[in-house]
Amino acid sequence: MRDQGRLDHFLVFCHRTSILNQWKSAAARLGLRLEEWPCPPEQSQDADGLLVTYQGAGRQREALGERLKQWSLSACMAIADEAHHLGVDPDEPDATAWGQTFLELTGSVRLRLGLTGTPFRADNLAFCAARRMRVRLDDSGWVEQIRPDLCVEPRDLIAAGDVRPLEFRFQDGWVEHSREGHPDRDVSPLSAEQRESWRARNLRRAIRLADSSSIGQQVLLRAQQKLNQLRERQPQAAGLVIARDISHAEAISRVLMDDGNRVELIHSQSPQATERLNAFQSGEADWLVSIDMCAEGFDAPRLRVVAYLTTVVTRSRFVQGITRAVRMTPELAAREAIPREASYVFAPADPLLMEYARSWSVAEPYVLRPQEQEAEDEQPGVGAWRGPSLPLEAVEDGAGAVIRLKTPELPAFLQR
């Protein structure tokens, strides 16, 4: 459209400054010059477009609006990167500042393009420039969905060689729940537990680092073994551990360092966290241990192994975490055939995580759900006890079992 003379300028919104730099570099490879806003008028005068964070646009809405008046907006494209950050409640369209700012600044442009690989973060929130359509689901009645104009599924990218496939190794075992002073014990199978409150309790116990036979320790051990194998072919390969909280991340880091690994521990309270994340991308550390710093926008193609040891089990967070290990570079692509060599995910055999693993490479429609949903009542006494607990231990040899999944194509029996 630029070559055809239908577009003159581009206005790109991002949620992080680091992603602005990625857009600037990508545009330069296409012969386009994008300047970060705010900038002096003479610097942006001959630019092909502007880059701005959502927060920056909100703070300087008036000034940016005046600058845009110098453009012919009928020949301008506005791009919302990670558009799920612009979620607007249809019943309260003024409630979300970023979405409202985007609407006001781009109301007169020729095209608005929203890009996202992440489901919207809350029920009933829709990207403010997206199409909403009512769809009938068999006998379940009508639902409302966000309908994208173009959907590129991860499995399509895998087939094209643009990203790596993932293979999953889920550590199974029996989880024992005992109370101090009580001779009786409750034993629950990690991968087969159907009661939600017990499933959640099992996962909390499974990620603990008790002793060498614990499920969490086995996940770390097998992840290290796989990374060592991968480093024989790719010496710069690294691993990522996603922990539950800061103290948990520190404990994991100690285990990895005791095993002789070079570890970079980075979390939201770490000094110079962004700079250290950037340094890790081309650094020498074997492992990056983090909590929530390595989601969207973090790009480290040398990551080949992910150990998922957190109690966050939403599909969006799981997929965000594991897809840090699918990135490719032109240099890597030149050395590998298609499909690319797989990366690996290690995690406790939680039923929800295994369900997500079976479908991560397929895009799911985003459904706008009713605003109010009745929570299921828990059975009295189930999952409510928070007293002293014993270290997690393997019951018989259950902790030695590993459930293996490959994607995107799965055996029929795993798709039931």
Segments predicted by a language model, with ranges:
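Conserved Walker A/P-loop ATP-binding site and its immediately adjacent core
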Residues: 6-29, 244-247
